[in-house]
Amino acid sequence: MPDAVLTFGCHLPTFGPIATRGNVLAFARKMEALGYESLWASDHVVLPYTIKSKYPYNPTGQFPLPPTAAFLEPLTTLALVAGVTERAQLGTTILVLPHRHPVLAAKMLATLDHLAEGRVILGVGVGWMREEIEILGGNYDRRGAWSDEAIRIMRVCWSQERARYGGEFFSFDEIGVVPQPPRKAIPIWVGGHTPRALRRVAELGDGWHAAFTPPDVFAGDIARLRAECEKVNRRFDDLAITLRVGLSFRDTPGGADRKPLQGTPEQIVADIGRYRELGVGSFLLEARYRDLDDMVAIFERFAREIRPAVTPSPRRT
């Protein structure tokens, strides 16, 4: 799908010392003005002091933040951002489904989408941290089936005037969940790369929201996702293929251990081209920064040097 229009989003400053009201608002305004199409927030409700679960996105398996770090709740944060933006879509990367009752989550998301006039994208996942899920009352070992049901429930709440559902984990009869989203739906991008996650994308997702996956691994995942789509008679081309990836600039080329989109401008352009050939249509960029000024400077440089090289002009809606 290399001829499709590329879109680029930015991760908001939602964790660590830069996670302040002023920084979130200033960053959101600036990124929309630069032409970025979407703004994103991650999800952790609590950070236990002892985490035995393996973090899946770095070689050490250690979660990179201490339990004393601020971590803004994503839907609350996006509601704030909705009030100071007009065009940018607002997304979760990802909302951990077992953290919230699905009817409550449906209500919160519908309210956000109502106030944002239809700009919400729901990135979802089942979560990796057993400790956090169990603290919040979830069953870690059943979280996959539970999350599948949660997705179905949210769609029922968003589309039916008298919502009703009967399943293994939840059952309710004729409830009103108003307001509903302006589109009677919110796009759901399913995260994960395990066989079950890719099956969930094919069965229940509007898109796949991959994270930090190098191109060679990504190519294999795409092949497996195509196979899952065939099993359920789903058109692969109907899925949005999206990727969350780190971003940093270097003055000299990195070596063999260089991570994608972390290198010289020429390397970053080449990385984007390779992902684009594999079908990625939307990138969520997460800057590797020292402070907020550094974070903003990275995104300014990307808009100035990289974007013109990979797409004719920022797409504004």
Place the predicted regions along the sequence by residue.
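Active-site-adjacent structural elements that line small-molecule/cofactor binding pockets in enzymes
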Residues: 1-317
